[in-house]
Design a protein with these regions (language model features):
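N-terminal small/polar loop signature for handling phosphorylated ligands or for N-terminal nucleophile
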Residues: 26-85
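Short hydrophobic/aromatic-enriched beta-strand-loop microsegments
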Residues: 31-37, 91-96, 132-140
Length: 258
């Protein structure tokens, strides 16, 4: 059987270990012409294999657009992270990726809690709520996110998805393993169903509100007692935020200051 026959899907392995995925899609009937950087090469001569990296995403988005593909998939080095590219070359990573897989999960498991790391957007929280789920924004670090999902289930709260903005995703149905290939496969199955209906994945997250601006800044802590220095910085930021009219500190909050 060839369930993906008629679909054109590009794989970008970034010269990491994800090249095998193209062979699987091809065997299932997909047209994979335009797939790139499938052979492992630890020098990573084309771009860093990272679904968060702007250069990497720009490369695969361009490949999808130029090949007129229906979908694109990009993996990190060891295939525990992935992201999707839509029909017109639009990137579906970070908040958009979480929104898309959350939509799939909430269709299958209405009311599920979705655990994420701490840097997800307010727009994502609204999207999950509108889909009937509960957004549990936790700490950064894929182990923190996954372990929190496991803990909630053990406490009697249904959680079927734990995911970081980096693309680390763990599903309860897959024993909470952080498996980028499993995430990609689940989204491709969903995309194939939409394809038969004449729809595209980006339509599913059209209502997701995107941040006006999003930028990550990493500040070096120079004091040998870096924990104390970091804690002092958070205290100072909190004092500053409390003094600004119209600003509200989010509670509950499990990491940093929001």
């Amino acid at each position: 059987q060839h369930p993906l026959k008629g679909m054109h899907i590009i794989v970008d392995a970034g010269n990491g270990n994800g090249g095998f995925f193209e062979k699987i899609l091809s065997a299932l009937g997909a047209d994979t012409k335009g797939s790139q950087f499938l052979d492992p090469d630890g020098r990573f001569p084309n771009h860093i294999p990272n679904p968060e990296d702007r250069e990497a995403m720009a490369s695969v988005c361009k490949a999808v657009e130029e090949s007129d593909a229906d979908l694109g998939v990009i993996f990190d080095t060891d295939v525990d992270r992935s992201a999707i590219i839509g029909r017109k070359g639009e990137p579906i990573n970070r908040n958009s990726l979480i929104a898309l897989i959350s939509s799939v999960i909430l269709d299958e498991h209405p009311g599920s809690t979705i655990v994420t790391d701490s840097v997800t957007s307010d727009g994502l929280a609204e999207y999950i709520s509108e889909k009937g789920g509960r957004h549990h924004r936790f700490r950064r670090g894929y182990k923190n996110v996954i372990n929190e999902g496991i803990r909630l289930n053990e406490a009697g709260e249904e959680c079927w998805l734990a995911i970081e903005t980096s693309g680390h995703a763990a599903l309860r149905e897959n024993h909470f393993l952080d498996d980028g290939a499993y995430l990609a496969a689940k989204l491709i199955v969903f995309a194939a169903k939409l394809y038969k209906e004449g729809k595209q994945v980006h339509e599913v997250i059209a209502s997701l509100k995107q941040p006006k601006e999003s930028k990550e800044i990493r500040i070096k802590l120079t004091d040998p007692d870096f924990k104390a220095q970091g804690a002092k910085a958070l205290e100072d930021m909190k004092a500053k935020a409390e003094g600004v009219e119209g600003w509200t500190i989010v509670e509950p909050n499990y990491e940093g200051l929001r």
